[in-house]
Amino acid sequence: MLQMMKVVAAIAIAVLVSGRATAQGVVMQRNLSLGMAKTIAEATIAECKSKGFHTAAAVVDRAGQVLVILRDEQATPQVAEMARRKAYTARMFRTSTMEFQKRTATDPAVAAQRDLADILALSGGMPIKVGDDTIGGVGSAGSNLEQDDACAKAGIAKVADLLK
């Protein structure tokens, strides 16, 4: 009987110790607020509108989930979806969609990444970063490709002081 109690006690101790060793703590992460996302999207559209383009802008959070999609009243409907996919691509790959487009066009080892769901390899998407931490993405669609990039950058620039 004493032997059995020792075995049970040993098992109980092992379970308790192993449970503590594998327990996970709370994970703290930075994320975009809805207010900041709206500011970025509005500044993105305003920049393109000032150049005569009718565009859409989308902002996604660190998980790639949409926070904001805005479409100029004169923009065509498909540009909102394009903006969302550009924002998602920039967030997921932590780089501009222009760089993603170049990399996947020249490297056969990663070319298949273009075929993943919701990925769009066209310029106009920018990651939103705090230091090296990518906390979201912004996408602009509806102008020419160079201008879409500039508009997305302008959106991020509007909140640059808050991203430090």
Roles of regions detected by a PLM:
Residues 1-4:
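N-terminal secretory signal peptides that target proteins for export/translocation
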Residues 6-20:
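Bacterial N-terminal signal peptides
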